[in-house]
Amino acid sequence: IMGHMVNAIEQVDEFLNLGANAIEFDIDFDKDGIAQITHHGIPCDCGRKCTKKAIFTEYLDNIRQVTTPDDPELREQLVLLALDLKLQRISSAKAYRAGEDVAKKLLDHYWQRGNSRARAYILLNIPLVEDYEFIRAFKDTLKNEGYESYNDKVGINFTGNEDLDKIRDVLEILGIHKQVWQADGITSCFARGTERLKEALEKRDTPGYNYINKVYAWTLVRKSIMRRSLRLGVDGVMSNNPDRVIKVLKEKEFADKFRLATYNDNPWEKFRG
């Protein structure tokens, strides 16, 4: 269960208390591709305040504590951090610079270049395939800085509901054949059909297809849509209301089929139910 738009530091506890075991937050860049703040802005989901924010590096410092064993701030349940990268707000020419910057800030403030024991998995949410240079830069930077091992903790996810074959082609260009999630969804203000979601699930379940390991639906607020997504076999849901998802998961139909992921689970492996 991914808590959606958790952009203020005080919201982290709020969403975890509602039952989320993953959080998504928005990264806003300046015109040069430097990550500045966690901030969504207007418009955003119905019934939500769009303007909450924090300085990105301070947010990382806080979330490091929340995901570090034996830290007083530890919240054991939080296993995944989804960085919603607002690259569509800057020139595609700055995507590489943005990738370098986010990698360095994670190295300095989250992983602390090997001195941190923070253990959450990181999902890089890229809005459009045209911004794929962000991924190249991120990986180049880890390599150049001597921390390629952190690649094991990082997954890739394109969130713009683009053609799945087009996404596969870009992953092929980047040489990425693992640790790939696929999102499908729309703002909670609107309804969305299931055609593309079903296609993504079908590809996930195709033997030998290495470009989708997990599929999740966003942003779900109605229990009927949560049930529909679970029946289709999604790996996760993003919601403004994690407590509603918890209630649905406890229903007889789903209680034996789904559970919340923990650190004993590998987020990059296809689930074989």
Swiss-Prot record:
One of its GO terms (cellular component) is extracellular region. It is found in: Secreted. Its cofactor is Mg(2+). GO terms for molecular function: lyase activity; metal ion binding; phosphoric diester hydrolase activity; toxin activity. This is Dermonecrotic toxin SdSicTox-betaIIB1bxiv. Belongs to the arthropod phospholipase D family. Class II subfamily. Mg(2+) binds at E24, D26, D84. One of its GO terms (biological process) is lipid catabolic process. Its EC number is 4.6.1.-. It catalyses: an N-(acyl)-sphingosylphosphocholine = an N-(acyl)-sphingosyl-1,3-cyclic phosphate + choline; an N-(acyl)-sphingosylphosphoethanolamine = an N-(acyl)-sphingosyl-1,3-cyclic phosphate + ethanolamine; a 1-acyl-sn-glycero-3-phosphocholine = a 1-acyl-sn-glycero-2,3-cyclic phosphate + choline; a 1-acyl-sn-glycero-3-phosphoethanolamine = a 1-acyl-sn-glycero-2,3-cyclic phosphate + ethanolamine.
